[in-house]
Amino acid sequence: DYKSQDSDNEFLEILAEGGYQVGELAKYYYKFHYPDYHYADITSLDYQESIRATNEALEHENVVIAEPAITFDNFFIRVDVLVKKGNTIKLVEVKAKSCTSDDENDFLSFKKTGVSIQSKWRPYLADVAFQTYVTSQAFPEWSITPYLMLVNKSKETNMDGLNQLFTIVQTEENGEMRLGVEVNEEEINASKEKIKDTVLQDVNVKRVVNSILYSAPLGNDNFFDLLNRPLSEFGTENSSTFIEAAHQLSDAYKNEISLDKSGSSFGACCSKCTFCYQEIIPNYNPEEKYISSIWKFPKNKIPELFEQKVFSIKDLRNNPGLNPLNPNTKSYFRQSLQIDLTANNDLSEWHSDDISEVMSEWNFPLHFIDFETCTVPLPFHKNEYPYAVIASQFSVHTLKENGNVKHYQWLADQSPIDPTIQFVKELKKILSNDNGTVFMYANHENAVLKSAKQRMLPNKNEYKDEIDFIDSITFTRGEHEPERAMVDLCRFVQDHYYHPLTNGSNSLKAVLPSIMATSNILKQKYSNPLAFGTNLENYTLFQEDAGIVTDPYDLLPKLKDLISKDLDNALFHKDSLKDGSGAMKAFQVLQFSQISEEEKKGLRKGLLNYCELDTLAMVMLYEHLNSLLKK
């Protein structure tokens, strides 16, 4: 790999998806399905030792090998599972991704123009295709059938405690801290038959892999166009195949050759790429506002605009004939507003004519809520489906009509029990005491509560009060809504308010620092230590550095200060929980891994701080909007 700016926490992505646990379960799945085969688990991370151990295991006529090391030319791979019967090989790539059947066609898109691979499956099929190629070259005498091993979300689990069989642990090898899985061998072996028929699903992908390797050239709308910019452009010919491109890239990596991207076209996701965005745009300026930041801008139009030398929002404003935005869409007004204000360097806030009328319909006390959740591929309990939403934490700020604010919070303890139902019970205690309007930011909270209801329905008599509570505040768009249906503040902002400093984003993380930069009432109130709160009481959230307002999220204590002076030895390496995915990963670490009490307390404190500020940010947004109307 080329070094990514985000690579320090790539292991957390795998952890959050349940990749470690699914990978370990897959080993036992094949081990138990082939009880008469020799079994070898190649655990060494050393190149030479892993290759030696693999070759030793391959001397067996029939063998199941977990994580074998295979090398060819400049390539070195670790296959997840390899099943060998003579020269007949089952090559398995394990992914903690969901499927609904063993049909390879589920990965394909069938259109009048032809058959193609669905974009969401391209990275995974690329992976298994590459592994198949390397293995076939290293062992040309083998007959290889590639498989993707996935999690079938339509399968109920057949046992209790499946998730708890695998615990994430931290190990040290050659001075480096790495993640591993501690397996409850006794319980695993006692559940052999259930493990063989659990939620995992292997899918034969030989036809697709053969098409990738030997038929389809790289190019627009073809397989490996992951960035909407074919890798073949890095080669000498536009018809470079997948295999040729792989060799070109490996040669560049081996010889430390920087790939020339100056002639490359601009793809839909280049603006988020950590590698070459600055190289593609002439005279790149990080302070400039580029067209990719326009709200709901059609990313597929960016390449042709770049060819016309239209890079920035000002460029687009100066070339109205090249503007691809559709005036018949609901987003057009807001897009045009962003373009005009940005091009004119105008920081004026906009609000709709009816914003006051809409806000007058809200009932005090106002409740601002935020949930933290995670999904797990391996269920906690029998008869549950994979990827159920686990509700792990909430924060509620309640604002009374006299301006008084009170904060409530709840965070699940580390426990083998799914906390979702207790989560609902605790939330109900807070929100059922009045008829005040409940606010969320985006639809997440609505979806979480509706998901929790579905899990309660099999025992609806036992959970009648909780189900009635959920029904009183949740809704389905397009259907009749209850009188107290939650208000989506994000949608409210989209429809009624715009601040130029958000740079087109409606995220609360963008809205909060923007309003703080221009709001007198927020400066007046939050320049003093907070007189309320659970974790944030006495914090001063309005601070300036050289005349620039500091993002309040950056004022929260760093995790290294909450956990340990030696953060490198902590399992969780992120220094803040500024985004929801960081919070989700932190809870995953708390729930499914073995960590020190010091790290556990620090992570809990960080989670509580972060979630409390999320709902306080919603209070601050309301206070700012209310002050605008009073003007």
Regions found by a protein language model. Name each.
Residues 1-631:
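DEDD superfamily 3′-5′ metal-dependent exonuclease/proofreading module
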